[in-house]
Swiss-Prot record:
The modification Isoleucine amide is found at residue 69. GO terms for molecular function: hormone activity. This is Atrial gland peptide B. One of its GO terms (biological process) is neuropeptide signaling pathway.
Length: 122
């Protein structure tokens, strides 16, 4: 009797929460249903920090950027990325300059191992 009463109270509580709540549970995570991804006035931050709709800070949504596929396929994307200071660090040309090659990583690993062996032998 007591278990049935508790089960009924639990079901009623959950149903009222689901109806009155603004949140939706998707794969165990909570998302705000009435909050859309929009550009913020803080262009240098990767997250939408504006609280115009009263969203809490822990529900901040990352901004999404969409680029035309044809422009990217034609090769015009790199030129526009180089001019935009926000996407300049994400340019593939700059990444290729800053990223060490596998050959140089292998050489530095070999030299580090040989130095460690020579230190251990002394």
């Amino acid at each position: 009797m007591k278990a049935n009463t508790m089960f009924i109270i639990l079901c009623l509580t959950l149903s009222t929460l689901c109806v009155s709540s603004q949140f939706t549970s998707v794969l165990g995570k909570i998302f705000v249903t009435n909050r859309a991804v929009k550009s913020s006035s803080y262009e240098k931050y990767p997250f939408d920090l504006s609280k115009e709709d009263g969203a809490q800070p822990y529900f901040m949504t990352p901004r999404l950027r969409f680029y035309p596929i044809g422009k990217r396929a034609a090769g015009g994307m790199e030129q526009s990325e180089g001019q935009n200071p926000e996407t300049k660090s994400h340019s593939w040309r700059e990444r290729s300059v800053l990223t060490p090659s596998l050959l140089s990583l292998g050489e530095s690993l070999e030299s580090g191992i040989s130095k460690r062996i020579s230190i251990n032998q002394d």
